[in-house]
Amino acid sequence: MIILKAFKDLTRMKNILYQELPHSISVLGGLHHILQNNVFQLKMCVDSWPTFSTAICYHQNQIGSNFKEINEKYSIFSKNQNSLRSLLTDDKLKWRDGLEFEVANHHSQIVREIASLRGFHVEEDGGYYSYINYSPEKLIMSEKTSTLATSTLNESHAELVVQQLPYGGSDEINRVKAYIRHLPNRCVVDEKGHPVSWVLTDEFHCLRMAYTQPKYRRKGHVGHLRFTLVQQKISEGLPVFCQIHKDNAASISMMSKAGFTRGVETTYLMVKAEG
């Protein structure tokens, strides 16, 4: 395992990952975060350098980490299952309860196999596809039929966001607070200043947790918020993406109409201790 630290190496890797889109989109987003300010203390490792076949961008809790309250997350890009297996069994990767993996669906079995060998089981959430917008020219804004104001979330809104997630708990509260505190987000507020629609971004530059309260739907709020965030990200020279479940026909239609194209199937894996 080689951990890339030098700016020239990370910049070179960025150019290589661009050539591997759409398969590399999440790792590329994490690399962009590292090159910007790396608030989330991400690391980038590869199987070899200056050429590589597998790259893992990850946040690993260590002594002195500012984000110990957030589950460790690993985003994987690989063109070779043998090199992927080698990286995942490297001693520098500390397998423990709560690890999260984001990986192309056809690589998920390797993660499950190694987790089992290490005495863990894996909870799987699959069936997601990346939807990517590569340039401002391909960005189509949906019509907004509301006069409500646009604003940004603050940490006091974290519980409101988590209430609308299909999963929750203290881990998600901490994660959402960190996203709101450190990363771009947008929301629409009602006449009293309360958020009624919002979109967040994560450390891999993925649009996440989009939600609109029922009485405010069908007014173009989420589309408008996504458009604003996408413009910002693309202006930074980065393709913008989100992950949508294959059964979410409404979101797929919305993103397709906005100029996003479908990428690869993604599976999320959560490592759990046995027993």
Residue ranges, per PLM feature:
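Acyl-donor-binding surface of acyltransferase catalytic domains
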Residues: 41-42, 48-148, 269-271
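Conserved hydrophobic beta-strand within the GNAT/NAT acetyltransferase core sheet
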Residues: 207, 240-244
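Conserved active-site alpha-helix within GNAT-family acetyltransferase domains
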Residues: 107-121, 246-264
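Conserved beta-hairpin
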Residues: 41-58, 181-197
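C-terminal helix/juxtamembrane-tail motif
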Residues: 264-275
